């Protein structure tokens, strides 16, 4: 199953893997990791993904010369009133990126939303987890 096929199959769904706090952004990433990549889920909140060291992944800080690629897990810091993140941050799955924008599969942004495609800028993006060799 290719990434874009998995995205299409999950678009518009409300994914709540842990059955706590409703459909959170972390639930989407956990589903991506466990159901698509067949890897263990990462513990914690979205903001924790910027500090974690996961087998097979490398953290890439957000700088003007770095861009995520399809399949990277993008992490936003928080709280940030301008972009609407809380202290828990936000995470989403990168699908495409340019110097000014990135297209992601996101959930719970805006709060309560199901999975949706969202064109974002880089405000409050801390960086992304990138699969080694991916």
How should each PLM-predicted stretch be described?
Residues 1-91, 96-98, 105:
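Secreted/periplasmic proteins that engage bacterial cell-wall peptidoglycan
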Residues 1-19, 101, 111-134:
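Intrinsically disordered, low-complexity
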Residues 107-109:
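Short loop/turn segments immediately following the C-termini of beta-strands
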């Amino acid at each position: 199953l290719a990434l874009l096929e998995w995205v299409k199959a999950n678009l518009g769904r409300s994914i709540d893997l842990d059955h706590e706090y409703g459909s959170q952004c972390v639930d989407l990433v956990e589903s991506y990791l466990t159901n698509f990549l067949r890897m263990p889920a990462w513990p914690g909140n979205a903001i924790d993904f910027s500090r974690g060291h996961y087998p097979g992944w490398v953290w890439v800080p957000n700088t003007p010369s770095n861009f995520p690629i399809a399949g990277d897990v993008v992490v936003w810091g928080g709280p940030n009133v301008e972009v609407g993140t809380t202290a828990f941050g936000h995470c989403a799955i990168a699908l495409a990126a340019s110097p000014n924008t990135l297209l992601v599969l996101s959930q719970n942004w805006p709060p309560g939303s199901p999975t949706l495609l969202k064109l974002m800028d880089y405000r409050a993006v801390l960086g992304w987890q990138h699969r080694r060799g991916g």
